[in-house]
């Protein structure tokens, strides 16, 4: 299947906001220059997610990701995808109050070419988000199932199952929008509730495990390409059996080495 490239035009905050009700946004994670370069002219935005702590570093959750780690990977992504709109997840513990949040976001802006930061939290984080946006930091919000809360909430739990939770999620989205966020990730939320959230605000809602009626979708690249074999969330679609293809290729390489068919005369100096 050939890849049809449209005339590539880098996204910015205005274009992202204007996509509401006009264009479905495609967001994908990346953690290094190689994959970022592959994705940059296809996806609308690249997220350097703290999910790298799991899929890249092999940790059980995202909580031990550090700011230094996120800055390192964001620089790698920006080096590989110089024209992409890049968002960095602010890791757990880096935005516990207004001053700490601003200090760490300024450090991100100084050390990387990231276009925006992403912060988990709703009404409880609205004051912090407002402080950041008032000081020229572009913020993407994140509500619903929030991976940085996994230990305090006892696991990954789908949100929006009760009327009370539905109303809280809508309040969260409205509060984050009023605080100045340009977009919000809504994760692990019942699809009918995610649709109501999308309709309740004027900024794009990017869904992950939140149904088809959001303004766009985000997936972790290793999930989407079938590299993570241990577990497949219900909301993930494998567009490639990446793990099997890689193992087959490496196995063939090993066989070629053992039977001396690699390198060939054509591959020698």
From Swiss-Prot:
This is 3-methyl-2-oxobutanoate hydroxymethyltransferase. Keywords: Cytoplasm, Magnesium, Metal-binding, Pantothenate biosynthesis, Transferase. GO terms for molecular function: 3-methyl-2-oxobutanoate hydroxymethyltransferase activity; magnesium ion binding. Pathway: Cofactor biosynthesis; (R)-pantothenate biosynthesis; (R)-pantoate from 3-methyl-2-oxobutanoate: step 1/2. It catalyses: 3-methyl-2-oxobutanoate + (6R)-5,10-methylene-5,6,7,8-tetrahydrofolate + H2O = 2-dehydropantoate + (6S)-5,6,7,8-tetrahydrofolate. 3-methyl-2-oxobutanoate binds at residues 50-51, 89, 118. GO terms for biological process: pantothenate biosynthetic process. InterPro entries: Pantoate_hydroxy_MeTrfase, Pyrv/PenolPyrv_kinase-like_dom, Pyrv_kinase-like_dom_sf. Binds 1 Mg(2+) ion per subunit. Catalyzes the reversible reaction in which hydroxymethyl group from 5,10-methylenetetrahydrofolate is transferred onto alpha-ketoisovalerate to form ketopantoate.
